[in-house]
Amino acid sequence: ISLGTTVAYIDDSGKFSRFNEMANIAREGEPNVVNQSQVVPTLLPKDIDLLTNSRENNLVIMGRTNSDTVQGFRYLNVGDKRQQSAWFKWKFNNPLLYHFIINDEYYFLDTDNFLQSIRLVQQESDPSITQDNVEFLLHIDNYTTDTGSSSYSASTKLTTFTGVSWLPLVTSPNYDLVVIDTNTASARVGRYGKPTLTSSTSFTLPGDWSGVTLTIGYLYEYSVAFPTFYLSRQQGEANRADVNSSLVLHRIKLHFGKIGLYETTLTRIGKTDYTEVYESTELDEYQVSDAPYLEEFIKTVPVYEKNTNVDITLKSSHPAPSTLRALSWEGDYSPKYYKRV
């Protein structure tokens, strides 16, 4: 495939596949070949047979037929230099049959013969809540605003939704169905609830949800596993990490953009995992009619562990945004006064 000024291909000769990129291709001389998957040597499985890319979005997605997981490579070029690149993976509800990218949308066909799409750029029709001239995107799958007719019962304190004709068309849902109040004039904009299915086309929600603009869809999990932290220094155009030093992490600081509800998990050697759930807004800091989201926020997470003894994971299974922009850490560093030769 062509990435613009370079060409990329899959090398399937080993136990795991490799994603190579060729540059400086000319009639005379050999091109420069770089193994872009060297930083994730076990990420790409063998026998990859589905490959698609979007040069406009600097994105390559690859996968295997009858597999429910695809791997992605995102890159950023400025001029003739590669400034940044990253690997990620997506897991679908059903195995994949075919996929392609067109008009800034990633389309994939699963084993249910259901053609679905993921938008690579923001569209005007994407579900969101606008507050104080700031737009907060809602992160749900298979979303819609057509929930049929609803009625509230004061005796049962339940709102019943009927005539939800699309509900039985969603096959093999792996996550929870949620309903979100997206009416900015509502007294409780941003609230969400998990309904109870009463039939194939109806469900109930606790509380009064009648007469407001609602968005309904399925939750999905967002997870970021951070690598081991080392003190690094820039030497020329490269950064060198001091892996022989002693570093005790005291705390990390998560620099968020638009943020709602999220959680962190510390996986420590010899200790039980520690999970903490955070809400971005603080008490007595916002009105009851405001959505509980912030435009930007810096959260300090205490660690107090040696850098090689802890793995840190950021997760969010909430419809609110969780935009991580940067991360910094503080700790006790010692070079151990080794003499290097």
Where are these regions (language model features)?
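Beta-sheet repeat architectures centered on beta-propellers
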Residues: 1-341
